[in-house]
Amino acid sequence: KGKRWGYFPSFSAGWIFTEEDFMKDNDWISFGKLRASWGQNGNQSISNFIYSSNISYLPQGYYFGPDKLVTSPTAIPANVPNPDVTWETSEQLNIGLDARFFKSNLGLSFDYYNKMTKDWLVLAPILGTAGAGAPYINGGDIKNSGIEFTLNWKGKVSDFIYGASFSGTMNRNEVTRLANAEGIINGSSDVLSQGTASISRVEVGFPIGFFYGLKTDGLLQNQDDVDAYLTPEGKPYFEDLRPGDVKFIDQNLDGLINDDDKVMLGSPLPDFEMGIQLNAEYKGVYANATLVGKFGMQVMQSYRSFADNFTQNYTTQIFGRWHGEGTSNRIPRLGYASTRNINLISDIYMHDADFVRISNVVLGYRFNELLRNVKWIKGASVYTSVNNLYTFTRYDGMDPDVGYAPDSWASGVDLGLYP
């Protein structure tokens, strides 16, 4: 109540400087405009009644702790209500330039943006003793800032018409506030395999949904490596170490490999995204091509943990496992008694996922010239197209451009499924 409506103002202004007297006599710039805007938007893409709680009917009763305390049919709140939840508001500043040069053959568009998302709507982690699911809260603030640009050229040589466009985006994402004491929200567990900790995290000062786990220093190649892998007190980190095991890094040098040694492993958010559009036409024959690319992001290959299990099938990458000194420094030995190598979340699952993809190619022919005397047909064409023709990447998974994650704010988990 009292939060069913919102007020979200916006302002914009522009200056077409090529219409000024001091620009009238130039012959190299056809159009130029400086612009700026500021505005707010409220997020309405949310479920209804998130401030309240539905009632769940449990015909078989429910568990609370180790004992089944309620054995008869019952009804419980599905989640903890939050009557104070309110709008998620995005506040954005844009400063840009639009320009065309050389009789409008060359075009340029440039934008700087600074966007602050306030009162981020997120499911709040709660203790199991709450007896119901997590409520939605206004959990924090997230900042996105960067630049966007587009550069295009069009030209004509006799009957040959051609054009090219290049666009790019550089974005920096940072969580600036979280509405809990720790300033941290951990993602879902059991993502890589049953019993594993969360792989994604939200933390103040870091990009949203970054990957979190243990750093490694390769594999123990021989018994000398095993004997040398000791704590500061000179004791083995694990009693059952063997050649082919992962060498986890003790970040704080406390003699233990645990959650205190976990650090940022990477981010599923790219540093730079680009797009290229090419087109050409000659006497009715035309061709178009679209390329897209992303750079500076990482992917967590979750399917590896399932593949490295005796009860599941294997991928061909298992042939690159450690099976003797020098055979691998990334994929550990196969083992049944100890699952530490694959169950501890570490950078052995992390991969750079830079790529450039030919996303679309079209080849066609226009019959406009042949049909110019047919009054009841304005135009016709025949064409063939190919989508996702080829991806240039060093990533060895199925698809580097994965968006899956079990949490709405996370991404970049590769399940090894068909794209």
Where are these regions (language model features)?
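Extracytoplasmic gating/loop element in the C-terminal half of outer-membrane beta-barrel translocons
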Residues: Q221, F238, P243, K294-L389
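C-terminal beta-signal and terminal closure region of outer-membrane beta-barrel proteins
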Residues: S56, Q60-Y63, G139-N144, D190-Q221, ...
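Transmembrane beta-strands of outer-membrane beta-barrel proteins
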Residues: S30-L34, I95, L106-L108, Y162-A164, ...
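Conserved small-residue
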Residues: I50, I137, K154-G266, N387, ...
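Outer-membrane beta-barrel signature, preferentially recognizing the C-terminal barrel domain
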Residues: Y62-G107, P135-V157, G205-G213, S267-F272, ...
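Residues on the lipid-exposed face of transmembrane beta-strands in outer-membrane beta-barrel proteins
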Residues: F11-W15, I95-A99, F110, F149-W153, ...
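Solvent-exposed loop/turn elements at secondary-structure boundaries
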Residues: K24-E88, N105-I142, A179
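Transmembrane beta-strands of outer-membrane beta-barrel pores
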Residues: K1, F17-E19, W38-G42, Y112-K118, ...
